[in-house]
Amino acid sequence: MLLLFFGMAHAQVSFTPSPISTNGAERAAVDMNGDFLDDVVSVTATNVQIYYQQPDGSFVERNITTTPADNTPSWSLSAADFDKNGKTDLLYAGGNGVTFMQANNSDGFDEISFPQYVFSQRSNFVDINNDGHLDAFVCHDVAPSVYYINNGDGTFTFHQGDIGDYPSGGNYGSVWVDYDNDGDMDCFIAKCNVNGDVNERSENQLYQNDGAGNFVEVAETAGLKDNMQTWSSAWADFDNDGHLDVFVGSSSANFTHKLNRNNGDGTFTDISASTGIHALTTTGIENCTYDFNNDGYADIASNGNILLNNGDLTFTLIPLALPNNNGSLGDLNNDGFIDSFTGGQIYYNDGNSNHWLTINTIGVESNINGIGARVTITSALGTQIREVRSGEGFKYMSTLNTHFGLGQDTEIATLTIAWPSGIVDTLENVAVDQVISVVEGSTVLGLNESVTNTLILYPNPAQHVLNLGDTTDFTNPSYSIFDMQGRKVMAAPLDANAIDVSTLAMGNYILKIQDGNTLKSQRFIKE
């Protein structure tokens, strides 16, 4: 066990490594089958190896043979459901081009490769034009970056330039964030000049989205036009003031890491000197942010080191808490604490007494994963924000589930999801230490919902009849069933403890039971 003690017991961070046999060096920790449990993924040119996480934290291994990929994810791997079939697709960002592995309805993958030369770096899935379909963005090292607009029919149209358009590239670490709180996704690109020269090629860029699909480069105005050498950045609201701040990690010993505080007016101030981050003198390419000790403040993982957020815009260095590439991050035993997967090992977070909440976002008008949604919670600790993102850090793919630490708070007063479509869902009095799923638009009528995932369903998977456990809490309930596209496929009064699901197509669904102001939901699989 790697034990790292910091301050009071509730702030400790410790990880226990556990071996896992994997194929390939390109990895992800992400739900692949629509059950919202983070799975362990490794890929090669001809194989997708998935360890499907089970509700008890165990795994079931499956290897899926693919056609030999024209491009392997030698530089980065991204994941999302771009065709809305309830299964997660993969993007392979290679040194010569880009390949999509589209998860089909036969439990395999169909290859889609593009002919254009792309020296890929970080890749992301994001709805660039906000039409409800996930597009893809790929940093180009030696030319303007490229993006693939989703046509809504499972195909993409290739574009180059406009976002990350410096002629000789230098585009390394893209991350899509709403830095100006205007409801649309902007793009920050961490840049580098591989020969070490400091010039325009290595000046970080920030592209502001005007909401109409047009992007304007504003890094200099915002105070983020640094020409340090960097491969990635980590964006979070480190002081819980409602504005996203940014840690820019140096990849060169000639530069230091920077923490820039969002002033709330579209500009940033370098506050590095007062934060303690300069205790981190090692450099590298992987930077991301999660609340590793669930104390309600986002921490920074930088090349295996953790900068533990003290809650006052200062950080305490925990050296080499994780492997030096951070790994793919997610909850790999469904206990509410963030774990890491890398190098044939899962590093399980040993946790503490702090509380937590995980939210699964299911888009309807927006993209099905809810990528680009802003999730806000308010508890006694204060207000926290998160965004749903695909592709953070530099190389690996981490969870699409939204994770909050809550310290010792035992209830969340309000939970709000602002979707890319403009729809806003609000839940009140949400219990802690649970995973909830929210379908876009399910609360817009203002219902004061108490959402839990305590429904007992059996058998699950079900073929003909789905039985419910104890329903004595209900007096006059009705039920609705939603598919993974957020469509309501069944609805009726619940007059027995069994629901006939024989007419449903095979796949993943969410059952919602509503009784007055109470709403309970649970996932199930139809076979």
Model-derived features with residue positions:
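Acidic carboxylate motifs that coordinate Ca2+ or other divalent cations, activating on Asp/Glu
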Residues: D35, D39, N85, D131, ...
